[in-house]
């Protein structure tokens, strides 16, 4: 099955801490890890692991974080021909604090993800399409309008879309 994912690509910086900070509070973290992330990238990796032929459409910066964000997808066989490099914006980054129970706080600096436009999309998207709302809404709406098959929309982060 062919799946196209139109979505975000981030580098996740995950810090574990004994507790999450209250507003204005600083806590000392225990560990820091760097992982590929972004809802789109995560969806592409999951679909690839399940045996689908996956193409990811997104945008990264012209920086070292892009290489880290894309390396695992490339290794897993995700088609990255739809990923463009933005020379004016950095790769998206998610700063994630996690406590021992798994509760988390996340701040996303979208960076190049906000530069994905309808012009970057193919005129027809064959097979299944997966989208989410970490890209500009007009790009997500254009992708859905060009899809010829099943569409799976993860409406997160929640925000208004047209019908």
Kindly label every feature range from the protein language model.
Residues 1-9, 71-85, 96-163:
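Ribokinase/PfkB-type carbohydrate-kinase core domain
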Residues 1-59, 64-68:
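Glycine-rich phosphate/adenosyl-contacting loop at the front of the ribokinase-like
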Residues 6, 31-34, 57-62, 80-91, ...:
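Beta-strand->loop->alpha-helix junctions that form or flank phosphate-binding loops
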Residues 15-26, 71, 91-97, 148:
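Short charge-dense sequence patches
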Residues 20-23, 64, 90, 112, ...:
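Flexible domain-boundary/linker segments
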Residues 50, 76, 89-92:
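Short, basic and Ser/Thr-rich N-terminal targeting/leader segments
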Residues 66-67, 92-93, 163:
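Short Asp/Glu-rich motifs
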């Amino acid at each position: 099955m062919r799946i196209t994912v139109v979505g975000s690509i981030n580098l996740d910086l995950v810090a574990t801490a004994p507790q999450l900070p209250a507003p204005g509070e600083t806590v000392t973290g225990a560990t820091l890890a760097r992982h590929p992330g972004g809802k789109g990238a995560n969806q592409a990796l999951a679909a690839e692991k399940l045996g689908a032929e996956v193409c990811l459409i997104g945008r990264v910066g012209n920086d070292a974080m892009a290489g880290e964000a894309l390396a695992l997808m490339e290794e897993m066989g995700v088609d990255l021909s739809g990923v463009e490099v933005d020379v004016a914006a950095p790769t998206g980054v998610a700063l994630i604090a996690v406590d021992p129970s798994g509760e988390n706080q996340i701040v996303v600096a979208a960076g190049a993800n906000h530069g994905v436009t309808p012009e970057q999309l193919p005129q027809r998207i064959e097979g299944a399409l997966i989208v989410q709302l970490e890209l500009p809404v007009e790009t997500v709406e254009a992708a859905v309008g060009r899809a010829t098959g099943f569409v799976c929309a993860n409406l997160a982060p929640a925000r208004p879309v047209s019908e």
